[in-house]
Curated annotation (Swiss-Prot):
Subcellular location: Cytoplasm
Originating species: Staphylococcus carnosus (strain TM300)
Gene: frr
Functional description taken from the UniProt entry: Responsible for the release of ribosomes from messenger RNA at the termination of protein biosynthesis. May increase the efficiency of translation by recycling ribosomes from one round of translation to another.
Protein family per UniProt: Belongs to the RRF family.
Top-rank lineage group of the source organism: Bacteria
Record-annotated disulphide pairs: none
Protein name: Ribosome-recycling factor
Keyword Signal: no
GO cellular component, one term: cytoplasm
Gene Ontology annotations of biological process type: translational termination
GO molecular-function term, one example from the UniProt record: ribosomal large subunit binding
């Protein structure tokens, strides 16, 4: 039974981490190197993350500077950033790529908050599915005589506690991101 509980906790933690990674790519009106986290560059035929091909600096609150390690990859990186539809317009001077992060309009902020809530809801659904799987495993163990009926009840209560904690954590992560987006 403790195996089921530890796996439940681990899977729910992964769902929360996945949500955090997904939220990190959302532009909240400030430059952040995570903005380019999902951008893959076609580098010698292989899709390669920008972070492996260039250093990404934030010299000003709304400016990203991408300095390729290999200057020949500059145009490929610029093309990949354009293709990623991040709502930014990269400009190159032959040495580095500068990306001005535009200020968000109120309408765009509300749109982003809606997207964030949708991502959060997906994470909660994932957590509830994990709860269902864990409860099914516990019921199967009880049917097979591995655990008693009392242990089943205790186990399902523990799974519910882990679920509640995980959903609270998701709510906290969402609240922080919404506050970040709505702050001007």
């Amino acid at each position: 039974m403790s195996d089921i509980l530890s796996e439940t906790r681990s899977r729910m933690k992964k769902s929360i981490e996945s949500l955090s990674r997904e939220l990190a790519t959302i532009n909240a009106g400030r430059a952040n190197s995570n903005l380019l986290a999902g951008v893959k560059v076609d580098y010698y035929g292989a899709p390669t993350p920008v972070q492996q091909l260039a250093s990404i600096n934030v010299p000003e609150p709304r400016l990203l500077v991408v300095s390729p390690y290999d200057k020949t990859s500059l145009s490929d990186i610029e093309r990949a950033i354009n293709a990623a539809n991040l709502g930014v317009n990269p400009s190159s001077d032959g040495e580095v790529i500068r990306i001005m992060v535009p200020a968000l309009t109120e309408e765009r902020r509300k749109e982003l908050v809606k997207d964030v809530k949708k991502m959060g809801e997906n994470a909660k659904v994932s957590i509830r599915n994990i709860r269902r799987d864990s409860n099914d495993d516990l019921k199967k163990d009880e049917k097979e005589g591995v655990i008693s009926e009392d242990e089943l009840r205790t186990g399902t209560d523990d799974v519910q506690k882990i679920t509640d904690e995980s959903i609270k954590e998701v709510d906290k992560v969402l609240e922080e991101k919404e506050k970040d987006i709505m702050s001007v």
